[in-house]
Amino acid sequence: MSRAGHRIRTERLGAPLAAAVLLAGGLSAWALTGASAQAAPASVDAQDDFNGDGYADLVIGAPNATVSDKAKAGYVAITYGSASGLSTANKKIVSRSTSGIPGSATAGERFGLTFTKGDLDGDGYGDLVIAGGPGGSVVLWGSASGLTGGTNLAGYGQAPQAGDFDGDGKTDLALFAHSTVAGDDPPSAKAALWKGPISRTGTPAAVLNILDKSEWWGYDEDDASCATGGGCEEDGDSISGPIVNGHVGDVNGDGKDDIVQWVYTGDGTWGNRLLIGGASGFTKSWVPGEGASSDVSGTGVGDVNGDGFDDVVVGGDGWDSKVRVAYGSASGLSDANTKSFDQSLPGLYGAEEEGDGLGTAISVDDVNGDGYADIALGIPGEDFSGLTDAGSFALVPGSASGFTGTGSQVFHQNTPGVPGVAESGDKFGATTALLDVNGDGHRDIAVASTTENGDNGAVWLLRGTSTGLTTDSALAFGPDDLSAPATKAQFGTSLR
């Protein structure tokens, strides 16, 4: 079952997000507004709720931050949800210099570049796995008081992903070793599938090869799979990379989560790879954006047309600025069942221009509560009002027929109610995330500008409602507001 399928939706009274920012040009101060009385929160994914209070918690990566005098050592910031939304006072900052976290701050490690959420030990609290490069990943464990502890996953420091990959109802962990681009061919790196539950000492129920035997190969049988024969040259304990990030969902509706990864494909290009979940490891399948671009392209997974199969949404790349939606089915994804759109879609504005970055960031989830996942698109290269690369983001609603453009919304820093003032080079919309931080049953959007305030970075939050996103009581904050390292941190490089 996909992550979306784990949600139990209940209706409750909506409420303001209890935050407004007072700005003039840059981020300088923020003020809270009063919150109205509310009923109990709607149920949310355990993976998003670290303290079990019924509100999703936002994780923010600042991988370029200087920590303990180590440049680009990096950290993550966790801001906990509540009935009134996020508060900069209710937070946790985690780096390699944090007490209880294995290792020490290391220059260039970029701790927090990627991370994943999931209830690994089955206690009902979401846990957080932070990629730590060559130093391995670190697990922080959820509890009634929030994230605690720190368990090292040595040897697996790149783009971990949590999900129920074998369909047994328990959260598994796909782990990948750190690797770097070193030539034209993508290097292979160690990888493993840890079956859940996973204990707080870092011990899984079992360890499987990352790839099913049908994906192994050798020189026997005319270079075919060596699953039933000998002579394997490569088996299932490694996979090509480096892997930059990943997104989880169930594209074929078989009750087993799948992963879409952004990986190095060779000869200077990057692209998507789809791993189909199974009882004995992953198999590979077609996905849009396979090795087609040398530019970073956003990807999101969710059920846009509400048919029970998760769809894969891929942003525009260096060759075109079209967003592609590959609709899921019992047989998975196919080019024939893939549709595309650009900025001429009804409800969007602006001409299709090279460098806009339509879909550089993509998040897919249900904002208005109608049962269809909506598509949030970062457009960080958008030019307007004489400004270059000021940036914007759009929300394209889902429907029974998929995307139509009807009801689409576009926001930037000059939109009334959005804190701040648009400036050239802000690249507002560089990253996005959809999650219900105030528990009203509507996904709210977090959106970042990593270049705000001289590359310090900042994050905005707009509240979701039954009619889409609203700027009422919008919130914006930067690392200074969290008493976190700020200089050149690129706060908001990753959001989840």
Report residues per predicted region.
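Mobile, glycine-rich extracellular loop/lid and propeptide segments
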Residues: R110-D119, Y125-G142, A159-F165, A174-A177, ...
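A detector of repeated loop/turn-to-beta-strand junctions in beta-rich toroidal repeat architectures
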Residues: A71-Y75, T88, D127, P134-G136, ...
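Hydrophobic strand positions within the blades of repeat-based beta-sheet folds
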Residues: L58-I60, V76-T79, V94, F111, ...
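Short glycine/acidic-enriched loop and turn motifs that connect beta-strands
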Residues: N64-D69, P134-G135, S179-D184, Y264-G268, ...
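Blade-edge motifs of beta-propeller repeat domains
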Residues: S2-S43, Y80-R110, W141-Q161, K195-G241, ...
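Acidic/hydrophobic-patterned starts of short beta strands in beta-sheet-rich repeat architectures
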Residues: G52-G61, G122-A131, G167-F176, G253-W262, ...
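Beta-propeller blade termini
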Residues: A40-Y55, G61, G112-L120, G157-G167, ...
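Long, internal scaffold/assembly segments composed of regular secondary structure
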Residues: P242, G246, V251-D317, S321-S329
